[in-house]
Structure formats: structure tokens, C-alpha cells
Regions:
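Short glycine-centered segments of the SAM/dcSAM-binding site in methyltransferase folds
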Residues: 47, 136-138
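C-terminal alpha-helical "lid/dimerization" subdomain adjacent to the S-adenosyl-L-methionine
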Residues: 4-8, 23, 58, 140-181, ...
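Conserved class I S-adenosyl-L-methionine
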Residues: 1-41, 57-61, 79-82, 154-157, ...
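Short catalytic micro-motifs in class I SAM-dependent methyltransferases
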Residues: 114-115
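A conserved beta-strand element that flanks and buttresses the S-adenosyl-L-methionine
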Residues: 111
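Class I SAM-dependent methyltransferase SAM/SAH-binding core
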Residues: 49-51, 55-99
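C-terminal lobe and adjacent flexible extensions of AdoMet/dcAdoMet transferase-like proteins
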Residues: 198-202
Length: 202
């Protein structure tokens, strides 16, 4: 791992992994998970992958919706340890978002919960998502939403965060990245500081 943002994220989340749900970040992301839970459409036996899965809480929640094959990817090995404990029947991988350990056109549903602003190269992530998601498959991104003026103020400084934050995005920026990589916009929802972007693989 040679990216400073990835290293910062890994160090930060390794420290808080054991009690993540009780930390500020853990509590902050509850609403993101709840919004994703309501929005995600999972069919029986779908292959579902949560990128930057953390302790696997979202995947655990999604098991209430349908029977699926669950996978998670996260850069923090300590978070992956917790995810395996929480979801013993699922498979988890330590890694970043730019090399997703799946074959071409293998995934039905992909989720990203409050993590997109940590990705060092979102273009590369979108390319990988396009590679591994089936035609007609879906990606759901629940991300921090800041009004334009706050993005202008925060973005020059957020990259110095010890937690590995890189940039806060507008919904149009996120959509454009994925439209340039073979996705079409399905829907956008806003709820307070959460933007939920749903895209479909063409």
C-alpha cells in the first residue's frame, strides 16, 4: 500500500474497529446504513458486495431482506476481523477499492456506505465497479452531502485529515464519474447530510 490516504484510513479504522459502533464515526454512519437498507433491491441468491464494508454491519442488516451471497472488502484488517465475527457465513477481503477481487461481470449488487470521500482515485474505482458488476446490476452509493459553499470551504483542507478523507463530492460529480464508465443514473435521494445515488450498469 503506497497511497497516503489509504494508509491514513487503514490506521484510523484499525484503532476504532473493536468498538466501532460506539465511536463517533460508527454512530454517524447509522443513518447511511438505514437509508441503504431501505433502498437496496436484493433478489434471492444475488451476489452482494459492500465496498469499504467496515465491521460488516450493513451486510448483516441486508440479510433481513432476502437470501444472498454476501462479500465485503475493506482496507482495515481489524475491521475485517469484526466483519467476519458478525457475518460468519460471508466472505471478506482486505484491500482497497481500486482492485476488487472478483471476476468480470460477477456481481449483482454493490454498496458503498459513507466511504466514497475516502477513495484516492474514484475514477479507478468506477472502472473496477464497471468490470465486476453484471450488465443490469446496481451500485448504491450513500455518501456525505455538503452544499456547494461547504464543499468549497472544506475540500482544500479535508485532504489533510488523519482519517484519510480525500474530497467531498456533489451528486453530479459522482454521477458523471460513473456515467463515463458504463453506468446510467437510476435515482438520487437526499436526507439531511446523506445523498444516495443509485446507478445501473448498462
Amino acid at each position: 500500500m503506497n497511497n497516503k490516504y489509504e494508509q491514513r484510513s487503514k490506521n484510523s479504522y484499525n484503532k476504532k474497529a473493536e468498538n466501532y459502533d460506539e465511536t463517533f464515526d460508527g454512530k454517524f454512519t447509522v443513518k447511511f446504513k438505514e437509508i441503504l437498507y431501505k433502498a437496496v433491491d436484493i433478489k434471492n441468491n444475488d451476489i452482494v458486495v459492500d465496498i469499504a464494508c467496515g465491521n460488516g454491519r450493513l451486510l448483516q442488516m441486508l440479510t433481513k431482506k432476502n437470501s444472498f451471497y454476501g462479500y465485503g472488502v475493506d482496507i482495515s484488517e481489524k475491521m475485517i476481523e469484526q466483519a467476519k465475527k458478525l457475518n460468519p457465513s460471508m466472505n471478506f477481503y482486505i484491500g482497497g477499492c481500486e482492485e476488487i477481487p472478483f471476476k468480470d461481470s460477477e456481481i449483482d449488487v454493490m454498496t458503498v456506505c459513507a466511504a466514497f470521500h475516502h477513495f484516492p482515485n474514484p475514477q479507478k474505482f468506477a472502472e473496477e465497479a464497471a468490470r465486476v458488476i453484471k450488465n443490469g446490476g446496481d451500485i448504491y452509493i450513500a455518501e456525505v452531502y455538503l452544499p456547494a459553499i461547504l464543499r468549497i470551504i472544506c475540500n482544500p483542507f479535508v485532504r489533510f485529515s488523519k482519517a484519510g478523507d480525500v474530497k467531498f463530492y456533489s451528486p453530479n460529480e459522482i454521477i458523471s464519474i460513473f456515467e463515463n464508465n458504463g453506468f446510467v443514473k437510476n435515482d438520487i435521494e437526499f436526507s439531511g447530510k446523506v445523498q444516495l445515488i443509485k446507478m445501473k450498469r448498462k
